[in-house]
Amino acid sequence: MPELPEVEVTRRGIEPYVAGRRVERVDVRTPALRWPIPPGFARLLHGRLVRKVERRGKYLLFEIDEGWFIVHLGMTGTLRVLRNVPHPPAAAKHDHVDWIFDDFILRFRDPRRFGAVLWHPRSAGDVLDHPLLADLGVEPFAPSFSGALLHRKTRGRKVSVKQALLAGEIVVGVGNIYASESLFRAGIRPTTPAGRISLVRYDLLADAVRVTLAAAIEKGGSTLRDFVGSNGESGYFQLDYFVYDRAGQPCRVCGTPIKQIVQGQRSTYYCPTCQR
């Protein structure tokens, strides 16, 4: 599943193309995604100017005068910029939505159809008040994200620290891959109850989350199965993993074999020596 780095890589790749440009047409081939694309969506966007593209958690927010259309990549979704000159590229089976501009197409592809294309009218208030966005945690690169925040929000909680990161109620966008990698950098075992971790160790974890996500964005995200950036290129951060998907391989720091366990039906990877 695309996590925060992959969504941010997509946003950075798309915005220079679409910001300040008008949508000439929208082709909706598959309205039945995770949630149905609203009727009249294509007509609503016809001729509209895209002001900017922002990100909240794993959601992409495209602003036009009348509101915002929201895109979530789901498990296998991608957004690609494709040149339509001299001929528009043919759509394949899993290409569900095209936003057509004068000299390129923004194409949403999603083989498993767990992604979403939604509409939030300006009359309904700010886009951050949308039901899917209103209760999200703090952004990991925001000044308000800190070890003190993690420490305060987890007091009395028995859930594991990894599950607390994944929940998205405290901090957004830290999915399975980057939770495992961040906990390794901080030297914290993922099974540790969140409420038992000290402020000092949470300071280390907050720094580790930021460093890990920034490094992943710099490498274009991770490509394990489906993800490609807006230009169709794969990410390369998976080559730098310390623990994720490395079960049985030696730790890059101490040489101890990486251990794999299951938490909440998801695989967790850690070093039994480096992480306490």
Curated annotation (Swiss-Prot):
SUPFAM superfamilies: Glucocorticoid receptor-like (DNA-binding domain) (SSF57716), N-terminal domain of MutM-like DNA repair proteins (SSF81624), S13-like H2TH domain (SSF46946). Its EC number is 3.2.2.23, 4.2.99.18. PROSITE patterns: FPG_CAT, ZF_FPG_1, ZF_FPG_2. The active site is at P2, E3, K58, R266. A zinc finger (FPG-type) spans 242-276. GO terms for biological process: base-excision repair. Its cofactor is Zn(2+). Keywords: DNA damage, DNA repair, DNA-binding, Glycosidase, Hydrolase, Lyase, Metal-binding, Multifunctional enzyme, Zinc, Zinc-finger. Binds 1 zinc ion per subunit. Disulfide bonds: none annotated. DNA binds at H94, R112, R157. It holds the Pfam family Fapy_DNA_glyco. One of its GO terms (molecular function) is zinc ion binding. It catalyses: Hydrolysis of DNA containing ring-opened 7-methylguanine residues, releasing 2,6-diamino-4-hydroxy-5-(N-methyl)formamidopyrimidine; 2'-deoxyribonucleotide-(2'-deoxyribose 5'-phosphate)-2'-deoxyribonucleotide-DNA = a 3'-end 2'-deoxyribonucleotide-(2,3-dehydro-2,3-deoxyribose 5'-phosphate)-DNA + a 5'-end 5'-phospho-2'-deoxyribonucleoside-DNA + H(+). Involved in base excision repair of DNA damaged by oxidation or by mutagenic agents. Acts as a DNA glycosylase that recognizes and removes damaged bases. Has a preference for oxidized purines, such as 7,8-dihydro-8-oxoguanine (8-oxoG). Has AP (apurinic/apyrimidinic) lyase activity and introduces nicks in the DNA strand. Cleaves the DNA backbone by beta-delta elimination to generate a single-strand break at the site of the removed base with both 3'- and 5'-phosphates. Monomer. PANTHER family: FORMAMIDOPYRIMIDINE-DNA GLYCOSYLASE. Belongs to the FPG family. This is Formamidopyrimidine-DNA glycosylase. It comes from Paraburkholderia phymatum (strain DSM 17167 / CIP 108236 / LMG 21445 / STM815). The gene is mutM.
